[in-house]
Amino acid sequence: MSEHDRVVFDLKGYIVKPAVLSKNEIEIIKEFTLRQKNNPESLPPHERYLPGGPFAQLIAHREVMNVLLNVIDPDPEKIRLENVFLSHRQQGEGEWKPHAGGRTTNPNYAYNFHDGRIYAGMVRVVWELNEVLENKGGTCFIPGSHKANYNIRTNPVKSIDARNSGLWESYGCPAGSLIIFSEAVRHSADFWQNSQSPRIAIFCAYNHINVRHHKPDFKPAVIEQLAPKHQRFFRDVYHPQFD
């Protein structure tokens, strides 16, 4: 992780890495993911659901791991992947539902800086498989809210949460880009405003081996068929101190 990205992530709570995937990689993953969504019965059981199929190659993508090792834990054995889902939205579809933000003792939403490094809690990794126009439906953030002293997570302020408050920012990026953010930063989905193409984004939640936020729902048939280097991301939660 570059010093630039490290500082921006700490300052804003998120970073954007444009055009990480090649055009060929984008098309393969997008076509297969839409097939999972629209015609899963045409696939073998272990490829019908994420993270099965070609997407599995992105689980430990170097650009993802370069960040996670700097913001979750420097030991890759202590990083888990606990949730993966597809966000598919046509023109006008979406919602505005701000959440998170402010300091907390909940380890999934806590953001800390200690002894010269970031501990970001749960981290979302978003693969944008179509172009995103700025302020036209990408995920929105209140930058810096992951370190806010006022607890807007449990005590939200309507004038702050309003989309037109002037406090929210989003991003524009080409297809194949990567968005990485701390779950601690206040964020929201938005309404998709691109009539030329839908939003096709894959959201991943990475966490520390010590904690879990999501109820486990991965299909065993999918995980069992992953390569060993990817299966290790789906171990149960435990404290590895005495390994």
Predicted regions and their residues:
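Basic/polar N-terminal segments that are highly enriched at the extreme N-terminus
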Residues: M1-H4, D243
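Non-heme Fe(II) oxygenase catalytic core, chiefly the N-lobe of the double-stranded beta-helix
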Residues: E3-K12, L21-A175, W192-S197, C204-F218
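Selective for proline/serine-rich intrinsically disordered segments
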Residues: V16, S42-L43, F141, L226, ...
